[in-house]
Amino acid sequence: SYDNWELLLMDASPEWDAVSDLADDANDERVRRFELPGNGGIVLNTNACIQQATGDYIAFLDHDDILEPDALFRYVAALNKAAEGERPQVLFCDEDMFQKTGEWGQPVFKTQLNVDLLYSHNCVTHFLMVEKALIDRIGTSPEDVAGAQDYDLTLRCLASGARFEHIAHVLYHWRVHPGSTADGSADS
């Protein structure tokens, strides 16, 4: 496992105690909670968290999804393996779905970046980790891309000439539930 991380929790609904309880229960100074005056939606909430991040890289994790315990270790190993000046600026991995039944399924085994495929759909998706200096340079996502903010960020990273690296392990489990994008329903 990897110990040098911080977890930023954006509490856009402070009237509910779930996020503050989670931060308190963690009892770990690496877990930091921030409160917004109102729920600005996924893009504004994400952008506010990005502004609070202190690390060299920012990894995006949805509130209801699951990471393998060695995910950060594998990403950092890829960074450390690369020569200085050649480090990847955008990292992503294979993923699967965690079904409502409690079963794992539908693995997605990706390849190194395929630009043509990326222009047709978001073949990078999860577990997206981006160099903070790159985000500072290209900016955060605009509010009008809500629901596709990860894709927007990935495309803007590509347009900037960023170096991408695929980590060939299933490290991210996308939880399927009614209304989630993973569910494929019209409501998501």
Task: Describe every region a protein language model picked out.
Residues 2-38:
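Acidic donor-binding segment of Leloir-type glycosyltransferases
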Residues 12, 62-66, 94:
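The conserved acidic donor/metal-binding loop of glycosyltransferases
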Residues 58:
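Short aromatic/hydrophobic "clamp" motif used to bind/position activated sugar donors
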Residues 146-153:
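Acidic donor-binding loop at a coil-to-helix junction in glycosyltransferase catalytic cores
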Residues 70-105, 177:
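Conserved donor NDP-sugar-binding/catalytic core segment of glycosyltransferases
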Residues 43, 51, 98, 104-133:
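A recurrent flexible, glycine/aromatic-enriched loop bordering the glycosyltransferase active site
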Residues 36-53:
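Glycine-rich, basic loop-to-helix element that forms the pyrophosphate-binding segment
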Residues 164-171:
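Catalytic beta-strand/loop signature of glycosyltransferases that borders the donor
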